[in-house]
Amino acid sequence: MNKLALYCRAGFEKELAGEITDKAAQLGVFGFVNLTEQSGYVIFECYQANEADHLAREIKFEQLIFARQMIVVGELLEDLPTADRISPIIAQYKTLQPKHSSALFVETPDTNEAKALLTFCRKFTVPLRNSLKQEGWLTSSDNVKDSISLHILFIRPGCCYVGYAYNHNKSPFFMGIPRLKFPSDAPSRSTLKLEEAILTFIPINQEKKRFNEQMKGVDLGACPGGWTYQLVKRGLFVYAVDHGKIAATLHETGRIEHCVEDGFKFQPPKLKQMDWLVCDMVERPMRISQLIGKWLMNGWCRETIFNLKLPMKKRYHEVQLCLSLFRQLTKQGLCFKLQAKHLYHDREEITVHIVIMGKK
């Protein structure tokens, strides 16, 4: 098994290919990418043996922007016999001997064509899991060092990649997609973007510390209040900045102040530091990056989540340009952590999280 299979949103295969090639090169690993546009996944094949496993350990999954999942796979299994699809899969795993495996995922790429296989995948999972357990696998705990999950990626009927992922360095979700329910009282579906971002960037055991009733936040471009809703739900008092109307249900909470201003000109009251800044404005990504950079360098907020709307072409290049802008925070003596992700609820955009850790 000397390939990586990485899942993504259909249409972003080239961006993911560029990203994984760069990340591998930074670790001194080289290879080539096989991709089909609109397929929802890419294959990165390493030139040297065992390098795919090395990448799966050393590339921090949380630092991959366009990947929903990252697994090590072998050669594509084609034309699985309908009478016995399991034996060829077991044969591939026998070369691995996955003793420290804990879970099984039988998945497809996130495309309409591939998702037609999901009913089959669900039915196939049970007998395959039983066969794997008979081999002595799938008996480990997630907490065991270097424990893995086994992943089968069906790309079309009778055709799959067999692989695994390290539990400490992967998405915990089936197909790499968190299943979130739209809150009936939320003002807009955009609320799911911020909810997924918080789930992605903030450890669950830190959420109450990072979001609570003693905190204040700012939502730039808040109308009608989808992102404000997520902050208010977690107890924050929010300055909702927008010329447009904010949902009456948010006003009724008593936890917001509607500031009818331009988000690019707004400054925090009395220039006091806010705990949170969130922003989902439709604007050029570089202009948004410059705006967020201003807030961070002026000390107007400690933590921020914002969206960057991507251009139609050279999207990966634009992301690199925008994120490189935040290097100036280091020049200002600020220590920070930055993560960016193309979330499931994002479309032609990525979501970025930055937290200021202190000063040098």
UniProtKB/Swiss-Prot annotation:
Keyword Nuclease belongs to the record: no
UniProt entry keywords in alphabetical sequence: Cytoplasm, Methyltransferase, rRNA processing, S-adenosyl-L-methionine, Transferase
Entry EC number(s): 2.1.1.186
Positions annotated as active site in the UniProt record: K309 (proton acceptor)
GO CC term, one of those recorded: cytoplasm
Superkingdom of origin organism: Bacteria
Quaternary structure, from the entry: Monomer.
Stated role: Catalyzes the 2'-O-methylation at nucleotide C2498 in 23S rRNA.
Protein name: Ribosomal RNA large subunit methyltransferase M
